[in-house]
UniProtKB/Swiss-Prot annotation:
Region (Disordered): 11-30
Coiled coil: none
Domain of life, source organism: Viruses
Keywords: Host-virus interaction, Inhibition of host innate immune response by virus, Suppressor of RNA silencing, Viral immunoevasion
Entry protein name: Protein AC4
Chain intervals with Polar residues compositional bias: 12-30
Family to which the UniProt record says this protein belongs: Belongs to the geminiviridae protein AC4/C4 family.
Function: Pathogenicity determinant. May act as a suppressor of RNA-mediated gene silencing, also known as post-transcriptional gene silencing (PTGS), a mechanism of plant viral defense that limits the accumulation of viral RNAs.
Amino acid sequence: MKLFRCFKPCRGQSSNPHTSESQERNIQTGSPIYTVSSNYQESRTSRMLDFSTSLTPEGLPIFTQTFRQPKTPMPSRITSPKMVIIVNPGSTRCLGVQRQIKTTSTTTPSMRDVWKRLSQL
């Protein structure tokens, strides 16, 4: 009883115009190798280039898939933000604790004389 009847040799063109089927024979083992290649136009989302199936001496299929990473990876919107929006600018307690700024001033004797003259006017 054959379980893998769908892997029998196919001759001619496939019903899908974008795929082609070819039958090769492995020289070392003599077992047939079936290769299905797709001719889809390459896009950013399409990663699958080739899909080939070879049969073991017992007649079981071995699936081999080849993948290619996209040429230009899509930038992550989470790791590269364009702008930061502060929703409630009046609530500064959420952003951090504000410290009071200490100011120190020194007055020289000449400044005291100026203040005296100004206060007498």
